[in-house]
């Protein structure tokens, strides 16, 4: 499950397909044609960035790779929902003068480690 567009989302779908997986793209717009070519199931929401909540709520683990504010919002939604977040060169949660919020992202150094850590989270939550 991912946002279904290009870039990292497309590469995630390509990797999943090459391993025999089924891919789901939850698009921000209403035009299904914007889905990357590796998406099997297209969900065109028309929700804009609000679709990030649907992406996170559909997952047992989230892998965050680099990313902009959309990725940051997905990380925040996941942490708030108790969904395991695995990070590869992504945001760091440094909140000044706060002991309540800590960086709960599991840091990895390559894609294989990211998938392995995400799968651990799926096993523990299923």
Located regions from the model:
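Acidic/glycine-enriched connector segments
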Residues: 3-83, 91-94
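A charged, well-structured terminal subsegment
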Residues: 57-62, 108-126
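Short acidic-hydrophobic, aromatic-tinged amphipathic segments that line or gate anion-handling sites
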Residues: 42-46, 88, 103-117
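Short, aromatic/basic amphipathic alpha-helical patches
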Residues: 95-100
């Amino acid at each position: 499950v991912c946002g279904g567009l290009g870039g990292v989302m497309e590469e995630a779908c390509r990797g999943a397909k090459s391993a025999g997986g089924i891919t789901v793209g939850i698009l921000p717009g209403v035009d299904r044609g914007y889905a990357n070519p590796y998406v099997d199931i297209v969900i065109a929401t028309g929700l804009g960035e609000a679709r990030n909540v649907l992406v996170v709520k559909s997952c047992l683990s989230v892998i965050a790779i680099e990313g902009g504010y959309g990725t940051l919002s997905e990380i925040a939604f996941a942490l708030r929902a108790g969904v395991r977040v695995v990070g590869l060169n992504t945001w760091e949660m440094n909140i000044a003068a706060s002991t309540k919020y800590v960086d709960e992202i599991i840091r990895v150094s390559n894609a294989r480690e990211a998938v392995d850590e995400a799968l651990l989270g799926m096993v523990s939550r299923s």
